[in-house]
Structure formats: structure tokens, C-alpha cells
């Protein structure tokens, strides 16, 4: 990766794909339970309570698809959702401030790390950052892991309706990516206002296999 520039997102249309109903197909609480669907996978990763499950529900137009809780650490396994037999959406457990025993946190860390390192079908990782909190040390460690394993990722600032000025976030992301010597999309999304949903869908739709 040689460029330090943030590449803006182009709003190509992903709405056709996301008109289809996504469905839960598997959950994995340990590495032996991780399935292989032979379909492209896109993963959502971020700190506990950053809004991963809510965002998945928003882009899939189904508020009951991924279980949502105000309590950090409720997603305790990797959840897999099939979208129209074209794409697998992967909801990873949160890292950081989950109010769970250290042994459980370590188990989640192993599970998340193993999946991100070894998934053959993983095409894109969405690194979710709470707009109110900014990029933290744990987020940087995940980005380092992704780069070390040559995983493509994009930064998604969630809860963008909670902040009035995106410039500071933009500058923070720019500086962060410069230190990584990496270029990627940076998006701002809100489950409440639906800001950024169209752009995010478009970026995910690009990961599906082309029709032969």
C-alpha cells in the first residue's frame, strides 16, 4: 500500500441487491464452528456497542435481523447472514469495554483474530468507529492485523448524527491512514437518519461475484 490519500466513495447503486431479504444462516462460538459458504463475505468489526448489529439491520431493511442491545458485549459469537445467495454478511463480536470475564474476552479475541486471518472468502472488512469517541488503540490494532494479512478494509464512522462537524473525524481518519500508508473509503453513517446507507450498500455490492 503506497498511497496516503483518502479515496472518496462513489454512489454506485447497491439498492437492487439489498432489496432481497437477508437471513441468519449460522453462528460460530469457536473456530471449529466457522462455516464455509463458498460465497463472498463482508465483515463488520468494531468496539462493543459501536452499532454493528444496528447497522446491519439498517442496510438490510430488517430491524429484527441481527440482535441489538444497549448492553455492550451481547454479540457473543460470529453471526452469518445470507443475502440472496450472493453475499454473506458477518457480524463479529465487539472488542473493548464489554462487561464480561477476561477469559471470555480472550476467547472472543482468538475467534475474531482467527476469522480475520483465515477466512478464505472474506472480501471486505468494515471497521466501525463511534463518531463520538474517535479512533482508539484497539481500533488501530485491528487495522494493523488487517494490513498484516492483506485484508481490504474501509472505515465507517457510526452514529454520525451525534456529531455536528465531520471535519475533525475526516482529519483524524486521514492522519490515521497516513500512518498506515493505506488508502480506503471513509464513510459516515447513521442508523437514525440513514445517512451513508446508500454509499455503504454500494461498496458492499461491489464484492459480489460477477455474473458469468
From Swiss-Prot:
Keyword Cell division: yes
Molecular function per GO: GTP binding; metal ion binding
UniProt: GTP binding residues: 46-53, 73-77, 91-94, 158-161, 189-191
Claim: Nucleotide-binding is one of the keywords in the record: yes
Cofactor(s) in the UniProt record: Mg(2+)
Domain EngB-type G: 38-210
GO annotation, biological process: division septum assembly
Function (record text): Necessary for normal cell division and for the maintenance of normal septation.
Similarity section: Belongs to the TRAFAC class TrmE-Era-EngA-EngB-Septin-like GTPase superfamily. EngB GTPase family.
Name of the protein this chain belongs to: Probable GTP-binding protein EngB
Gene that this sequence comes from: engB
Amino acid at each position: 500500500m503506497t498511497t496516503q490519500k483518502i479515496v472518496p466513495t462513489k454512489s454506485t447503486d447497491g439498492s437492487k441487491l439489498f432489496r432481497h431479504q437477508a437471513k441468519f444462516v449460522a453462528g460460530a462460538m469457536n473456530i471449529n464452528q466457522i462455516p464455509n459458504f463458498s460465497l463472498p463475505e463482508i465483515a463488520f468489526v468494531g468496539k462493543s456497542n459501536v452499532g454493528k448489529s444496528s447497522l446491519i439491520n439498517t442496510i438490510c431493511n430488517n430491524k429484527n435481523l441481527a440482535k441489538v442491545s444497549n448492553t455492550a458485549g451481547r454479540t457473543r459469537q460470529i453471526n452469518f447472514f445470507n443475502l440472496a445467495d450472493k453475499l454473506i454478511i458477518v457480524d463479529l463480536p465487539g472488542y473493548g469495554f464489554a462487561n464480561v470475564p477476561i477469559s471470555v474476552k480472550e476467547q472472543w479475541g482468538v475467534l475474531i483474530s482467527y476469522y480475520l486471518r483465515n477466512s478464505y472468502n472474506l472480501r471486505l472488512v468494515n471497521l466501525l468507529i463511534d463518531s463520538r469517541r474517535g479512533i482508539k488503540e484497539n481500533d488501530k490494532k485491528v487495522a494493523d492485523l488487517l494490513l498484516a494479512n492483506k485484508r481490504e478494509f474501509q472505515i465507517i464512522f457510526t452514529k454520525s448524527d451525534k456529531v455536528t462537524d465531520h471535519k475533525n473525524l475526516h482529519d483524524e481518519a486521514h492522519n490515521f491512514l497516513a500512518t498506515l500508508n493505506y488508502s480506503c473509503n471513509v464513510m459516515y453513517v447513521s442508523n437514525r437518519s440513514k445517512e451513508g446507507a446508500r454509499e455503504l450498500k454500494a461498496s458492499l455490492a461491489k464484492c459480489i461475484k460477477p455474473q458469468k
